[in-house]
């Protein structure tokens, strides 16, 4: 390139006339390069552009998509918008239906409506988020929260969030904004109300505990009554069995001896037992007399 310029300079006539011609050529080339540079611009991905011309203002019918575009230098210049969704956290103190102070924070995912960029620029400019979002969020929050009591804001949080999102989305359309997502990120109350809620929860837990103890005592009382009735019925049945069959006591004694022998057999110690040790003295006269006297007493 430098060699070409030298060759071009060598061909030009020397003297003042030659210098003037060279200067004109350089100025012409510079003007062409500047014109080409100023006539071309690029719209990046996720952006849109509109034209503003110095005679008619914003061109309402021109919205430029991504890519390379041309303009008339000085007469037109592009205004580029980022149309990608951007998150923003907005906090607002407000009051509930029962006059409790509520601090609520929202995460709003918003983007401009690409089809309405010319009118948005005329009304709001490029800093539309700062002009619109805080005001409409505060407006909607105060309107929705005032419909619920403080306790309902906790128990019906999903419904509150849905109502806020619905009303805020409709309100944002008036300003050419699209809300992709609205979510409650924080919900807090005053210290006094929080302390009152905690005290109420403690009282409810104590009441539930007291009720549990009462029910437990009633259950134990019913269990004892059933047990006593069962023992009385068992005693009655035992008396009837003895009166009908005097040998029933001997049978019970044999079963008791069997249980004793099984327990001792599984023990590691070795013990030698007699019939007396196993309560098997069934032929003992004292045992027979005791059984007979018991049967006579039942009669």
UniProtKB/Swiss-Prot annotation:
Pfam families in the record: Band_7 (PF01145)
Chief location category: mitochondrion
SUPFAM superfamilies: Band 7/SPFH domain (SSF117892)
InterPro entries: Band_7, Band_7/SPFH_dom_sf, Prohibitin
Residues bearing the modification Phosphotyrosine: 128
PTM note: Phosphorylated. Tyrosine phosphorylation is indirectly stimulated by IGFBP6.
Modified positions (Phosphoserine) in chain numbering: 151
Coiled coil region boundaries: 190-238
Record keywords: Acetylation, Cell membrane, Coiled coil, Cytoplasm, Membrane, Mitochondrion, Mitochondrion inner membrane, Nucleus, Phosphoprotein, Receptor, Repressor, Transcription, Transcription regulation
Annotated region (Necessary for transcriptional repression), positions in chain: 19-49, 150-174
GO MF terms, alphabetically ordered: amide binding; identical protein binding; protein heterodimerization activity; protein homodimerization activity; sphingolipid binding
Role, per record: Protein with pleiotropic attributes mediated in a cell-compartment- and tissue-specific manner, which include the plasma membrane-associated cell signaling functions, mitochondrial chaperone, and transcriptional co-regulator of transcription factors and sex steroid hormones in the nucleus. In the mitochondria, together with PHB, forms large ring complexes (prohibitin complexes) in the inner mitochondrial membrane (IMM) and functions as a chaperone protein that stabilizes mitochondrial respiratory enzymes and maintains mitochondrial integrity in the IMM, which is required for mitochondrial morphogenesis, neuronal survival, and normal lifespan. The prohibitin complex, with DNAJC19, regulates cardiolipin remodeling and the protein turnover of OMA1 in a cardiolipin-binding manner. Also regulates cytochrome-c oxidase assembly (COX) and mitochondrial respiration.
Name this protein carries in UniProt: Prohibitin-2
Gene: Phb2
């Amino acid at each position: 390139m430098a060699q070409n310029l030298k060759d071009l300079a060598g061909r030009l006539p020397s003297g003042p006339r030659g210098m003037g011609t060279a200067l004109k050529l350089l100025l012409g080339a510079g003007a062409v390069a500047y014109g080409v540079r100023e006539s071309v611009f690029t719209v990046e991905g996720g952006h849109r552009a509109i034209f503003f011309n110095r005679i008619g203002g914003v061109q309402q019918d021109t919205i430029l998509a991504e890519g390379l575009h041309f303009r008339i230098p000085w007469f037109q210049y592009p205004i580029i918008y980022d149309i990608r969704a951007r998150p923003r956290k907005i906090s607002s103190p407000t009051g509930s239906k029962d006059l409790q102070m509520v601090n609520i924070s929202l995460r709003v995912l918003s983007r401009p409506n690409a089809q309405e960029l010319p009118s948005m620029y005329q009304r709001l400019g490029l800093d539309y988020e700062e002009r619109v979002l805080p005001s409409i969020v505060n407006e909607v929050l105060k309107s929705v929260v005032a419909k619920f009591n403080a306790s309902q804001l906790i128990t019906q949080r999903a419904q509150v969030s849905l109502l806020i999102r619905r009303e805020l989305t409709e309100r944002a359309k008036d300003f050419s904004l699209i809300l992709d997502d609205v979510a409650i990120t924080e919900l807090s109350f005053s210290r006094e109300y929080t302390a009152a809620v905690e005290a109420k929860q403690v009282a409810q837990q104590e009441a539930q505990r007291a009720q549990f103890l009462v029910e437990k005592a009633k259950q134990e009382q019913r269990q004892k009554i059933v047990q006593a009735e069962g023992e009385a019925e068992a005693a009655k049945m035992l008396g009837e069995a003895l009166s009908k069959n005097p040998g029933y006591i001997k049978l019970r004694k044999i079963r008791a001896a069997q249980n004793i022998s099984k327990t001792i057999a599984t023990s590691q110690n070795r013990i030698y037992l007699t019939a007396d040790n196993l309560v098997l003295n069934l032929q003992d006269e004292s045992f027979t007399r005791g059984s007979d006297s018991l049967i006579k007493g039942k009669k």
